[in-house]
Swiss-Prot record:
<comment type="similarity">
    <text>Belongs to the FliE family.</text>
</comment>
<dbReference type="GO" id="GO:0005198">
    <property type="term" value="F:structural molecule activity"/>
</dbReference>
<dbReference type="GO" id="GO:0009425">
    <property type="term" value="C:bacterial-type flagellum basal body"/>
</dbReference>
<dbReference type="GO" id="GO:0071973">
    <property type="term" value="P:bacterial-type flagellum-dependent cell motility"/>
</dbReference>
<dbReference type="GO" id="GO:0003774">
    <property type="term" value="F:cytoskeletal motor activity"/>
</dbReference>
<dbReference type="InterPro" id="IPR001624">
    <property type="entry name" value="FliE"/>
</dbReference>
<keyword id="KW-0975">Bacterial flagellum</keyword>
<dbReference type="Pfam" id="PF02049">
    <property type="entry name" value="FliE"/>
</dbReference>
<protein>
    <recommendedName>
        <fullName>Flagellar hook-basal body complex protein FliE</fullName>
    </recommendedName>
</protein>
Length: 107
C-alpha cells in the first residue's frame, strides 16, 4: 500500500491564495515517477522523530544539571518532548480504535 506524502502535490509558488492557486492549476496530481513513502515508513519516521525529540530533552536536562544549559533551553526542550509524546499517544489511540472497529466488522 502506497501513501503519497504532501510532496506529491507538486505545489507551484503563488501569492498564498489557495483558491486562486487551485483555479490557476497550482496543484498538480502526483505522477507515476513520484511515489510517496509507504505507511509503515511514514510511521517509522514519525516514531524516530519522537524518540529523537525525547532524547534531546533528556540531553538538555542533563546539560542544565551540569550548568551548561539555561532554564529557557530546558523548558523549550521539555515542552517539545511533551508535545511529541502526546501526539504519539493520540496517534496510538486512534490506531487501536481503528483496529478494534475493523475487528468488530462482520465478514
Amino acid at each position: 500500500m502506497i501513501v503519497n506524502g504532501i510532496g506529491a502535490l507538486n505545489l507551484k509558488p503563488g501569492l498564498g491564495d489557495t483558491a486562486t492557486d487551485l483555479i490557476q492549476g497550482g496543484v498538480a496530481p502526483a505522477t507515476s515517477g513520484n511515489l510517496g513513502t509507504s505507511f509503515a515508513e511514514a510511521v517509522s519516521q514519525a516514531a524516530s522523530k519522537t524518540v529523537n525529540t525525547l532524547q534531546n530533552a533528556e540531553q538538555v536536562s542533563l546539560q542544565a544539571l551540569k550548568g551548561d544549559a539555561d532554564t529557557r533551553q530546558v523548558v523549550d526542550a521539555v515542552m517539545s518532548a511533551q508535545q511529541a509524546l502526546q501526539t504519539a499517544v493520540a496517534i496510538r489511540d486512534k490506531v487501536v480504535s481503528a483496529y478494534l472497529e475493523v475487528s468488530r466488522m462482520g465478514i
